[in-house]
């Protein structure tokens, strides 16, 4: 199934003996999530259909958030990743949006979980697509970038999946040190606008 077909903009073509990063996520879905039937087949390049119950499953990008937080000195809050993917590289605070959450609520929750800082204001900046290898599964994301203001930046502490968090002058930031593709590109855009 789905062999040699190029799926979803920007994805690699599919061939036998591929790495997980090269597989379309729908290839990993073998059973209908509604009735459990193994007759869960390709419907088109974006979906699978159950031949028993007619359920159609469309694979869509997961929503994720990223925070640009500046302190009073104009320094950017930067984190160091504690876990893979890209463990040890620089990152910005953020993460997956929960069901029922707005992007603004999601970025505020993630900032609190990762840094202990309370977001009091958010302003949407832009979005970028990304892929994120998690537990052997390639997750396609749509990352929503926000400029955030926090209540008290003196309460900063690294928590959750952040090994370290610190303030960096914009002039010292090297986008190539950021491990995730979308965050690297987002930092480049942010620096171009704010330098």
What are these regions (language model features)?
Residues 29, 47:
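Residues immediately within or flanking Cys/His clusters that coordinate Zn2+
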Residues 157-187:
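NUDIX/MutT-family hydrolases
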Residues 126-154:
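Active-site-adjacent beta-strand/loop module that shapes the phosphate/pyrophosphate-binding cleft
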Residues 41-46, 60-63:
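Short Cys/His-rich "knuckle" micro-motifs
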Residues 32-35, 50-53:
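Short cysteine-rich clusters marking metal-coordination/redox-active sites
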Residues 42, 118-127:
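A short coil-to-beta-strand element that immediately follows conserved catalytic motifs
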Residues 71-113:
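Conserved Nudix-box catalytic region and its N-terminal flanking loop in Nudix hydrolases
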Residues 52-76, 96:
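Conserved N-terminal beta-strand and adjoining loop/helix that marks the start
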